[in-house]
Amino acid sequence: MPIELAMSLYLSSDEFLNPRASKYSRPLQPCLNQCKSSKLSFSSLKEQSEFNGVSRALMIPGRAKKHVSFADHKGLALTVVKIFSEFDDPIDIPDNIDNFFTSSLTVSEGKDKLTLDFDQPSADYLKFRQRIENDHVCLEHCMLKEKSIMGTVKVKNISFEKSVKLRITFNTWKNHTDVECQYVKDTYTGSNRDTFSFEASLPEQVPSHERIEFAICYEVNGDTLWDNNQGKNYRIIQSALRKSSNESNGGHQQYSQSDWDIHFDRYGSPRCSRGIFPHWPSYVGYEDIGPYY
């Protein structure tokens, strides 16, 4: 057995037990290298922050510190005042801008001179519905906008083919102008009423002795139906005339017999129960009241 003896003397015990083990065991190196110039301890950063009066847990090295300074610290004024003087030569304003401001002033002045000499028909909804059922046509709403009059008309849907016109005069019916009304699609379908809209231009100047009046014409099934404000026509007058009329009445509203019939209906009507007898609940005529739109 000379060979076995020689190998046991030559090999150490560790190499004999683990022949695949590395002969040299070196420690592993970290893969991230830290910059020596940027190594600042947390305690030093915290002390420096507390010294500067800033409560910061982390400071970025190399970043410039921000400073805030005001103008008065440097001997300057906090505000700057500029004074504009009048020009010796007039400013050259473009014609379109000059016309825009001039027309705006004219419109505002003319708008104040004209006013509606009637109440909105739809203000009394029950009477408004009754007029549509009886006369099949009624002015719903009207307003003055700049130098024009616009509004809406409600008609009873008797036939598909129909025509609605606005007949207006600016000189007390010496002559008149017809304006075709446009159909307006209702939001809610299934109603037996149709809505039409109109818009008519007003003259720049109206003589004080002349009146602006209009009426609504409804043509359907070969018949011509009119809404002329129950024979009085719808009038547009100067605001000064309406003010003088109110002052002559002593500031009190005049009521006719028809007006009293409107406000004093039979007991149980919606207006009477809400006005004179609010504690009387009643549903008389409630089934005849439909949606208002």
Curated annotation (Swiss-Prot):
InterPro entries recorded: CBM21_dom, CBM21_dom_sf, Pase-1_reg-su_3B/C/D_met, PP1_3B, PP1_regulatory_subunit_3
A Pfam family the protein falls into: CBM_21
GO cellular component, one term: protein phosphatase type 1 complex
GO BP: any one term: regulation of glycogen biosynthetic process
Keywords: Carbohydrate metabolism, Glycogen metabolism
Record-annotated CBM21 domain positions: 129-237
Keyword GTP-binding: no
Keyword Secreted: no
GO molecular function: glycogen binding; protein phosphatase 1 binding; protein phosphatase regulator activity
Gene3D superfamilies named in the record: Carbohydrate binding type-21 domain
Subunit-level organization: Interacts with glycogen, PPP1CC catalytic subunit of PP1 and PYGL. Associates with glycogen particles. Forms complexes with debranching enzyme, glycogen phosphorylase, glycogen synthase and phosphorylase kinase which is necessary for its regulation of PP1 activity.
PANTHER family xrefs: PROTEIN PHOSPHATASE 1 REGULATORY SUBUNIT, PROTEIN PHOSPHATASE 1 REGULATORY SUBUNIT 3B
Domain remarks: The N-terminal region is required for binding to PP1, the central region is required for binding to glycogen and the C-terminal region is required for binding to glycogen phosphorylase, glycogen synthase and phosphorylase kinase.
Its job: Acts as a glycogen-targeting subunit for phosphatase PP1. Facilitates interaction of the PP1 with enzymes of the glycogen metabolism and regulates its activity. Suppresses the rate at which PP1 dephosphorylates (inactivates) glycogen phosphorylase and enhances the rate at which it activates glycogen synthase and therefore limits glycogen breakdown.
Protein name according to UniProt: Protein phosphatase 1 regulatory subunit 3B
